[in-house]
Amino acid sequence: EVAVDTETSSLDPHQTDLIGVSLSCKIGKACYIPIGHNSKKCISKDIVLKKLKPLLEDPSIKKIGQNIKFDFIVLFKHGINITSMDDTMLMSYVLDAGKNRHNMDSLSEIHLNHKPITFKDLVGTGKKEINFSSVEVEKAKDYAAEDADITFRLYKKFYKSLKDEKMINIYEVFEKPIIKILDFMEI
C-alpha cells in the first residue's frame, strides 16, 4: 500500500499542470518527486510518469489518497489509470459524517494531533501569492512529503477505527465503489 499525492498548478484537475508527486508507504517516511517546478532540480515528467505507471496501475497495491479523485483525474490526464484506491476523506466521512471538516489539515490536527505546513505558508496570499511551480523545491518537498505521510497515517488510523467500530463494510460496499464512478464521471 502506498499513499499518493499530486502537487499541481491549480485546484481544477482538468486545467492544471502536474508539478510533483509525493509517496509514502511507511509511517514517518515519504518522498517528493519534483517534475514541474521552475528549477533545475526537477526530474523529467516523462521519465517519472513512466516509472510510476506500473506501481499506480498495479491492482495488487492499494493506493491511498486524501480526496484521491483529484489525483486520479490529474494522473489519468497523463496516461495513468490508478487502480485499487482508498480515500481518507471518505473514510473520515463514514466515521464522523457531519461532525468535523474532512480536509487533510483538519483531520491531521484532530486525529494525529499534528498541525501540518499549510499551502498558504508556501505560496502566500493576495498580491504576493505565487504558483506552486515557483515554490523552492526544498520547501515544496517538506510540504508535499508531509501530505503523503499524513495521508498514510490517517489511513492506518481510519482503517483500524472502521474495523473496530464495525463500519468497514459501509465504507467498502457503499463509499469506496463511488470513488471510481465519480472519477470517470468527471473525466
Where would I find each of the regions flagged by the language model?
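Glycine-rich, acidic and aromatic/proline-enriched surface loops and short helix-turn segments
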Residues: N113-H114
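Conserved RNase H-like, two-metal-ion catalytic cores of nucleic-acid enzymes
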Residues: E1-I110
